[in-house]
Amino acid sequence: MRLILLGPPGAGKGTQAKRVIEEFDIPHISTGDIFRKNIKEKTELGQKVEGLLAQGKLVPDELTIEIVWDRLDQEDCKNGFLLDGFPRTIPQAEALDEGLAKRGLKLDRVLNIDVDKDSLVKRLSGRRVCPSCGASYHIDNNPTKVDGICDACQTPVIQREDDKEETVLDRIKVYDSQTKPLVDFYNKQDLVFTVDGTLPIDEITNKLVTELKKG
């Protein structure tokens, strides 16, 4: 099963991706994870990506496409995958369709998690992370036990640069202009299933899994 997961930043795609890949035993291909690995290892690509993300901008198509196809051509993707964070633009979607066609493959479904702007800003700007152990928190729904201190390792938690409200609004604007049109692009191929991302997490999962099991 070859799937794409769409939705604005803060829609809960990561949570749903984990549940879907467990249910259908396919790998989760997250461009965000690939980029973060490069950033952590301070590769040349990682430094470019870090600068762009800090400004709420997208990584250029040619870099992203190269990384994605290198991953999709690996053995564990032979029977399917869940793409999260790619494609983000119409040219990327066209490049993906072209690459799949060359390999005699096609997409099965595009899952779209829809969340309103106010909810997204509240979710994202409330995030806090531990710079030491990577634990994540939220000031409203998952706060630290001691204010501002990581429960696991007692390091002061921080707000990531791309979770600050101004950057969040920029990220949403970029999503609306560049990625949201993908819903129309894939609707023309009759592939899109949209779910309300403000519903309880388990309810969202149930709707996605039920839809995918329809075949």
Swiss-Prot record:
Pathway: Purine metabolism; AMP biosynthesis via salvage pathway; AMP from ADP: step 1/1. Pfam families: ADK, ADK_lid. It is found in: Cytoplasm. One of its GO terms (molecular function) is ATP binding. Catalyzes the reversible transfer of the terminal phosphate group between ATP and AMP. Plays an important role in cellular energy homeostasis and in adenine nucleotide metabolism. It is an enzyme of class 2 (transferase). Residues 30-59 are annotated as: NMP. This is Adenylate kinase. GO terms for cellular component: cytoplasm. The gene is adk. It comes from Finegoldia magna (strain ATCC 29328 / DSM 20472 / WAL 2508). SUPFAM superfamilies: P-loop containing nucleoside triphosphate hydrolases. Monomer. Residues 126-163 are annotated as: LID. AMP binds at residues 31, 36, 57-59, 85-88, 92, 160, 171.
